[in-house]
Amino acid sequence: MSVFFVTGTDTSVGKTIVSRAIIQAMQNAGIQIVGYKPLACGQDDPVYTDVQESGQTDYDNMDNRDVLVLQDSTNEEVSYQDINSYTFAHTMPMLSQEGKHIDINKINTDLKRLSSRYQSVLVEGSFGWLTPINQDYTFASWAAEHKMPVVLVVGIKEGCMNHALLTVQSIEQMGLPLLGWVANRINPMLGHYAEIIEDLSKRIKAPLLGKIPYMHKPETQELGHYITDIDRLSYMKTEILK
């Protein structure tokens, strides 16, 4: 059983797109895998216009784009609730009263259930590495508690080198294996794109797992062929806390 954590250098750097690419690549290699988004936050334009709300769930709206992309990417039959513990309408629930209701035990239980059913589980964080989950945990401290290996998504833009190297430093200081990093081109007009990737490859000890070019609606496309080092993502076994 393999469980690994996907984090990013910032918000809107393409964690979900890279997660889709990884899921598709591993499935193409014959590996059973699902994605899991513990905490999904609000967005300006919901995918569904007809949103149903229920007071009997942990969800404001079951229309978060990231969760829906993960659900669409896997070959397994999973529901929205199977792969998401909390969806909030607000952008930063962990900084509001809503954050007090985020129960880490529920997240742990949901992860354990998935890891017992499927060969591999890709866990996608929200925002960046040190973002709070609630008053007691950050995504980093939670991943460290489970000893999850990490994949870093670097959105190639101005300032990404500083963000990437600081995140790598924090991951290493927490004693977690960095499986590798993925370059996601989010600014097609950025100069020195190749030079940035070359320099980061020299400075980050972990391998470059793939490069995803800028494209229209990547969430609807086959992206698996952009991930070129599947072995790094499947060889480590993770023991989920009981």
UniProtKB/Swiss-Prot annotation:
Enzyme Commission (EC) number: 6.3.3.3
UniProt keyword NAD, yes or no: no
Cysteine disulfide partners in this protein: none
Record: residues binding Mg(2+): 16, 66, 124
Active site (UniProt): 37
Catalytic activities: (7R,8S)-7,8-diammoniononanoate + CO2 + ATP = (4R,5S)-dethiobiotin + ADP + phosphate + 3 H(+)
Record-linked InterPro entries: DTB_synth_BioD, P-loop_NTPase
Main location: cytoplasm
Subcellular location(s) of the protein: Cytoplasm
Top class in the EC scheme: ligase
A GO MF label: dethiobiotin synthase activity
GO biological process terms held by the UniProt record: biotin biosynthetic process
Keyword list, A-Z: ATP-binding, Biotin biosynthesis, Cytoplasm, Ligase, Magnesium, Metal-binding, Nucleotide-binding
Recorded GO CC terms: cytosol
Pathways involved: Cofactor biosynthesis; biotin biosynthesis; biotin from 7,8-diaminononanoate: step 1/2
Co-factor requirement: Mg(2+)
Residues that, per the record, bind ATP: 12-17, 66, 184-185
Role description: Catalyzes a mechanistically unusual reaction, the ATP-dependent insertion of CO2 between the N7 and N8 nitrogen atoms of 7,8-diaminopelargonic acid (DAPA, also called 7,8-diammoniononanoate) to form a ureido ring.
Subunit and partners: Homodimer.
The family this protein is said to belong to: Belongs to the dethiobiotin synthetase family.
Protein name as it appears in the record: ATP-dependent dethiobiotin synthetase BioD
Record organism: Mannheimia succiniciproducens (strain KCTC 0769BP / MBEL55E)
